[in-house]
Each structure stands twice: as C-alpha cells, then as structure tokens.
Amino acid sequence: MNYRITYTKRFIKNLKRLNAAERAQLKKKLEILEMDPLYPSLRTKRIQGTVDLFEFSVNMDVRVIWQYDGDTIILLLDIGHHAILNQF
C-alpha cells in the first residue's frame, strides 16, 4: 500500500535546520515510508506514553515524529535531533 505524506508547518520549519547530508538521508527514508511505514531500516516505534504518535530514524541522531491521518495519509509532525522526543 502506498501512503501519501503531508507535512505540518512545524516540520517544514525544523527541516530547514538540517544540513544537506541529513536532508539527503531524509529523502531516501521518506521514499521507504511511503511504501511501508514499518520497514525495518526506519526503526519505527510508537512514542512511549502516546496512542497515535510514532517516530522513525533518519540516522542515529535525527528523528521524525508522525501519525496516521486516515487510512492512506501519514502526517509528519516534527523533525530534529533525538531530543525532540522529549516534547511528546
């Protein structure tokens, strides 16, 4: 199943803070996310203490926070270094 990916303003704002190498890594991971959000290399996990928020790893430091928005849409909420998980 293919998912459609949408973004929040917060995600776009924080995306601009990443360096070029991190953005290139993100592009590859988003291609995988569209096809299979639970693909092993994404290391997708539900965020502890939440019902509908998930994270996946861009690399060992950068994380993306997301949630399902219906059956075929993934909404990217935030991106940043590992500490962003403390906000959720």
What is the predicted role of each segment?
Residues 27, 34, 77:
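A cross-family signal for key residues in well-ordered alpha-helices
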Residues 31-56:
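A short, surface-exposed loop/turn module that caps and links secondary-structure elements
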Residues 2-5, 9, 13, 20-24, ...:
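Enriched for short, Lys/Arg-rich terminal
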Residues 23-28, 49:
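Phosphate-binding glycine-rich loops and adjacent basic patches that engage nucleotide phosphates
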Residues 10, 25, 41-45:
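Unusually extended, aromatic-enriched hydrophobic runs near protein termini
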